């Protein structure tokens, strides 16, 4: 295939190559953010907020964002006003998104299970929700009410008692946001029944969620037990630094899409889907894996054509031209499956003949979109699936945000005297084998008299 200006997408030809895991890890495109590099910058922010609370968080917000709200907590009146002023079409779409997401996540809720190992011997696994959760919703290039839905719905379904949404205060030359998070974010929170929203963003938001503090009006800002939600590299670094104090959902990097396609795919669809993810930011990854050189050439031409009318063209061109994006040529679909399993994309589309059969062979992906009528954009909004997904290859060992994220499994052990006596000899033997005699003695003494 040939790459023609102005398009800059790289071509990686793996035809005839030995597709070992080591070689693929070295060859496949992946940008990613160097979180380690910003830890020294973020650590003083976390320390300052841990020591000084809301005052420090607000000061950092004024320094980085140029706006300082009077209080961290958004007043109820502002939430009500945001919902009242929400465009009716947007409200209807959000309501549909919420309903569909609730339906899917309701089926994820685990039930307690009791296992009997003999008369009087049971182990019950109880699923208990995290008590208080902080949900981070970023600002930046776009407004993300969908992220409010995707974080809040599984937490509510899990039974989390206390939720707080944190999102950066917005500033415009006209001052129309008055130092509050974007009104669409506030409206989405209100639609979901969330009444605690903090006007704070960035690393300082993560630190304040982790350590808590006192607001400017002397109201308590209680710390959370877990923080979820995507953000930029500084947010990710702060989550890493705070994870010894709170649980986190993971470290989200730039968004990514991989498309495994053959000659049956429509190049216009493939190109549109690659552009749709590239418009997130300049570090977004768009990767096409195909055995068809005809599709590769046609997709390249479609990308060039569609870029002429793309609204965020500069951002998209930068993302598609970055080292994280490429068209990858493989010998056949068998090789393509091997490549995408190793790549472990956040979003993986299967646009091939017998797409469902091919999809059944995928073991590593944040989410899989099967066939020509399931674009990633559907999953971003109204499929019912969750769009908070592992990036940077983390799908090899982690899954996306779900109801389980907010649940803790607790084993409840219940044995009668007879049941313990029946197994006591094995307990004492194993304790002796591990040179932990007091363990065995704790059992033996119960039957000494």
UniProtKB/Swiss-Prot annotation:
Please list the reactions this protein catalyses.
L-histidinol + 2 NAD(+) + H2O = L-histidine + 2 NADH + 3 H(+)
Q: Which residues form the active site?
A: 346 (proton acceptor), 347 (proton acceptor)
Respond yes or no to whether keyword Ligase is given for this record: no
GO aspect biological process, one term: L-histidine biosynthetic process
Q: Which domain of life is it from?
A: Bacteria
Cofactor: how and how many bound: Binds 1 zinc ion per subunit.
Task: Enumerate the transmembrane spans.
Answer: none
Among NCBIfam families, the record links this protein to:
hisD
What the record says about family reads: Belongs to the histidinol dehydrogenase family.
| Described purpose of this protein according to its UniProt entry | Catalyzes the sequential NAD-dependent oxidations of L-histidinol to L-histidinaldehyde and then to L-histidine.
Q: Which PANTHER family is this protein grouped with?
A: HISTIDINE BIOSYNTHESIS TRIFUNCTIONAL PROTEIN, HISTIDINOL DEHYDROGENASE HDH
Question: What is the protein's name according to its record?
Answer: Histidinol dehydrogenase
UniProt organism field: Mycobacterium leprae (strain TN)
